[in-house]
Curated annotation (Swiss-Prot):
Protein family membership: Belongs to the BetVI family.
Cellular component terms per the entry's GO annotation: cytoplasm; nucleus
Protein's UniProt keywords contain Zinc: no
Keywords attached to this entry: Allergen, Flavonoid biosynthesis, Pathogenesis-related protein, Plant defense
Protein name: Major strawberry allergen Fra a 1-2
Subunit structure: Monomer. Interacts with AP.
Domain of life, source organism: Eukaryota
Function summary: Involved in the control of flavonoid biosynthesis in fruits, probably by binding directly to natural flavonoids. Binds the natural flavonoid myricetin with affinities in the low micromolar range.
Claim: Nucleotide-binding is one of the keywords in the record: no
GO molecular function: abscisic acid binding; protein phosphatase inhibitor activity; signaling receptor activity
GO biological process: abscisic acid-activated signaling pathway; defense response; flavonoid biosynthetic process
Length: 160
């Protein structure tokens, strides 16, 4: 098994505490509300929403995938760090065993956030992951993030 790591970083004008509440802690409610074409629904299969919880994410009509299953690996509300693993679903091919993600929000000098994301692709055998596939997924995630950011800017009293 190989592990391929990809890191991305982008910025937001929203401070980490507010962004973490919306984009991480309440994503299962907020994203289907503001982007139903991307995520139809999220449901907890097992657990209480904390570490070890298993969730099924069902994608919207326009998605190339039907659904995926996530396992929450870590939530650090004080340091704004969230990690989970994609363990089942049609986003995993016969070449990938699982994908682990970590998102960390840190304060930027302008009062906003720097979002640091690390993805670890655990492959079966000696398979290599093509960077263009990863970039396509990152672009979709970035688009969702921008929708959340836009929602927070338009609704300044939410997630305070």
């Amino acid at each position: 098994m190989g592990v391929f790591t990809y890191e991305t970083e982008f910025t937001s004008v929203i401070p980490p505490p507010r962004l973490f509440k919306a984009f991480i802690l309440d994503a299962d409610n907020l994203i289907p509300k503001i982007a139903p074409q991307a995520v139809k629904c999220a449901e907890i299969i097992e657990g209480d929403g904390g570490v070890g919880t298993i969730k099924k994410i069902t994608f919207g009509e326009g998605s190339q995938f039907g659904s995926v299953t996530h396992k929450i690996d870590g939530i650090d509300k004080e340091n704004f760090v969230y990690s989970y693993s994609l363990i089942e679903g049609d986003a995993l091919s016969d070449k990938i065993e699982k994908i682990s993600y970590e998102t960390k929000l840190v304060s930027s000098s302008d009062g906003g956030s720097i979002i640091k994301s690390t993805s670890n692709y655990h492959t079966k055998g000696d398979v290599e992951i093509k960077e263009e596939h990863v970039k396509a997924g990152k672009e979709k995630a970035s688009h969702l993030f921008k929708l959340v950011e836009g929602y927070l800017l338009a609704n300044p009293n939410e997630y305070c």
